[in-house]
Regions:
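Conserved SAM/SAH cofactor-binding pocket of Class I
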Residues: 31-115, 120-123
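Conserved Class I SAM-dependent methyltransferase catalytic core
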Residues: 18, 141-173
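Generic structural signal for residues in well-ordered beta-strands
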Residues: 13, 91-93, 161
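Class I SAM-dependent transferase core
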Residues: 1-37
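Mobile active-site "lid"/loop adjacent to the S-adenosyl-L-methionine
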Residues: 117-146
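Short loop/edge segments at beta-strand edges and connector loops
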Residues: 15, 95-96, 165
């Protein structure tokens, strides 16, 4: 079932109770990234889900915001939220795989990479029976190494990588 939530910044987001809905991690990450974005920077959110992070960063100084998402249904939700808020000139949602960013973007094309990656290693923890939710929570379609590799490819020299990682995952970085 779809719902439309109003965000603190006044924008609206379309969410689906059958899919992964955003949580406090995305809000905190957006706040952290917001403060560090400089005027005119190009920002990409890897694994954007329903597009919450680009929506929360809309009033930042970024020149452009891009969300990359592998799940087609999430791409649709995110794109409809962008359209609902008349933000098509600022936010672009791309359907694609983090492991294939070179097929979608030129090397070094972003100043900032933001991501709230799956926080569970695939074999750990109980997986949700919903594939959509499991993909968002567990390293099923990508892992932290894939995300770091994508960020390395996408970031300009001296670019910024803003992410949320559980403490027990920090050793991978």
């Amino acid at each position: 079932m779809e719902i439309v939530d109003t965000l603190k910044n006044g924008y609206k987001i379309i969410q689906d109770s059958e899919r992964f809905k955003f949580g406090i991690d995305a809000v905190m990450l957006s706040h952290f990234a917001f403060e560090k974005i400089r005027n005119g920077e190009n920002v990409i959110d890897l694994g954007t889900g329903n597009g919450i992070i680009p929506l929360l960063l809309t009033k930042s100084r970024a020149k452009s915001l891009t969300g990359l998402e592998i799940q087609a249904e999430n791409v649709d939700l995110a794109q409809r939220s962008v359209t609902l808020n008349n933000l098509s000139d600022k936010i672009q949602i791309i359907h694609g795989d983090i492991k294939s960013v070179s097929e979608k973007f030129p090397k070094h094309s972003f100043d900032v990479v933001v991501t709230n990656p799956p926080y569970m290693i695939n074999e750990h923890g109980k997986q949700n029976p919903s594939d959509a939710k499991s993909i968002a929570r567990h390293e099923i379609l990508c892992n932290l190494e894939d995300i770091i590799s994508a960020a390395d490819y996408l970031l300009k020299p001296c670019g910024k990588f803003r992410h949320h990682t559980l403490i027990n995952r920090a050793k991978v970085l």
